[in-house]
């Protein structure tokens, strides 16, 4: 049995890919997306091998009760936790009853564990090295249909069914706050183009009109990436897609941006994180405030929609900084491009994070909290933490509101707290950019409401 608790509103690639490996080896595999379907106790109790996918922090916290239940109902089962957040939380996972902890490129190790289990052998230790795998086409049979997952809302109000895949894994960069870094250590691995294209074709046949590439950075290998885009667009000319690309890479590979636009790229997500150069240096992001402005201009000139994401609240933020962030988003005409949840994101500090290397952060940190799987931090200015709570509450009560309306309310609130004059409101109007109805976020503390809802 393979279990996912949350995968950003996508049909879980982290179940479909290992399912292909296990089924090829002759195993009967049940895939359960617990964000969509009930986890049946009878299935848990009868499984020989239980794998729980942990691709992000929210999924990991939600997995705790699932793992405990599996161990209680099925003491002899071999329980594996796999994915980016498994190695980061290994002691906690083992305390819950997990037998095996796998990080990146987990498919071959899962298959090896299954092979040893079927032969009655003790599981052999897995390597700490990141292997180079020849992947299989993900097997999505048994998963909920794509129509039950996030959709892409177009500017004209129509919606597209969304599929997802990965053209590469890991990342060659070392951003301090990123969960990829402790696992991949600056390495990335490409997925063979024929595998990616076959996965896309299968999802198009299943109704997908849009594909989200889940790569941490699509331009880690730009030649590989564009080969896939060119082939995909040739085979499916009406298929749109979105990708995630660093600001640094948007500048380095600016010549490729028009090709993305011409190939039906709906938008490019980029983790801007902050507009403060000092904070960007702390995070080791590889770009500056000015670089962000250049990327905005380059994307506009190429006809690409840039969707910036932020870690809006962090220990170095001032009220004035937050007002500047909001004002800049408005001045650059990016209000419709930013999911309101991005304005409430708070820095997450998990175990093994490179953030723990920063002397400038240590003074703000408390002891590791097993309940939240992170190091809690308190801002030196209590007004900042109070603002974060209020912005989070505001966003949570405006889930169906126009983005401009929400941003106007947040700007007014922030300027009031900072003792600044009220801003000129951003003119109203419907969103003129496509967006997913399950906002993308990472490297962040989950909204408590998200945890309760899921």
Segment roles from a protein language model:
Residues 1-3, 23-24, 31, 43-52, ...:
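Radical SAM enzyme core and accessory elements
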Residues 222, 233-412:
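A structural motif corresponding to the C-terminal lobe/cap of the Radical SAM core domain
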Residues 22, 66-70, 74, 228, ...:
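Hydrophobic positions in alpha-helices of CheY-like receiver
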Residues 28-30, 77-79, 211, 241, ...:
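Hydrophobic anchor at the start of a short beta-strand
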Residues 144-305:
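Radical SAM [4Fe-4S] cluster-binding motif and immediate context
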């Amino acid at each position: 049995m393979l279990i996912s608790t949350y995968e950003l509103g996508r049909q879980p690639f982290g179940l479909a890919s290992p399912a292909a490996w296990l089924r090829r080896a002759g195993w009967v595999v049940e895939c359960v997306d617990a964000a969509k379907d009930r986890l049946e106790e009878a299935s848990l109790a009868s499984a020989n091998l239980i794998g729980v996918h942990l691709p992000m922090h929210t999924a990991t916290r939600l997995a705790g009760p699932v793992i405990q239940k599996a161990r209680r109902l099925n003491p002899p089962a071999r329980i594996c936790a796999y994915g980016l957040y498994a190695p980061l939380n290994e002691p906690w996972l083992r305390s819950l009853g997990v037998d095996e902890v796998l990080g990146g490129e987990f498919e071959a190790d899962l298959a090896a564990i299954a092979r040893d289990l079927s032969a009655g052998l003790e599981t052999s230790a897995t390597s700490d090295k990141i292997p180079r795998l020849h992947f299989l086409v993900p097997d999505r049979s048994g998963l909920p249909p794509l129509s039950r997952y996030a959709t892409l809302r177009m500017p004209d109000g129509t919606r597209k069914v969304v599929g997802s895949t990965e053209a590469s894994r890991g990342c060659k960069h070392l951003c301090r706050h990123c969960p990829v870094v402790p696992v991949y250590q600056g390495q990335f691995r490409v997925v063979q183009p024929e595998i990616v294209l076959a996965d896309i074709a299968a999802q198009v046949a299943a109704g997908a009109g849009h594909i989200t590439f889940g790569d941490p950075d699509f331009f880690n290998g730009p030649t590989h990436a564009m080969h896939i885009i060119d082939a995909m667009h040739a085979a499916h000319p009406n298929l749109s897609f979105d990708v995630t690309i660093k600001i640094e890479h948007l500048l380095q590979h600016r010549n490729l941006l028009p090709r993305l636009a011409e190939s039906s790229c709906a938008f490019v997500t980029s983790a801007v994180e902050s507009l403060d150069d000092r904070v960007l240096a702390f995070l080791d992001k590889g770009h500056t405030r000015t670089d962000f402005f250049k990327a905005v201009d380059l994307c506009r000139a190429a006809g690409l929609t840039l969707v910036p994401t932020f870690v809006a609240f962090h220990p170095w933020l001032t009220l004035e900084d937050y007002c500047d962030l909001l004002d800049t988003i408005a001045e650059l005409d990016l209000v419709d491009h930013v999911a309101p949840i991005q304005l409430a994101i708070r820095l997450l500090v998990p175990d093994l994070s490179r953030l723990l290397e920063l002397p400038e952060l240590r003074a703000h940190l408390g002891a590791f909290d097993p309940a939240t799987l992170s190091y809690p931090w308190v801002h030196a200015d209590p007004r900042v933490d109070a603002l974060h709570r209020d912005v989070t509450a505001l966003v949570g009560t405006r889930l169906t509101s126009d983005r401009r309306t929400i941003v106007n309310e947040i700007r007014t609130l922030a300027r009031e707290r900072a003792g600044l004059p009220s801003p000129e409101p951003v003119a109203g109007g419907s969103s003129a950019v496509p967006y997913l109805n399950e906002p993308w976020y990472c490297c962040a503390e989950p909204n408590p409401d998200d945890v309760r809802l899921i």
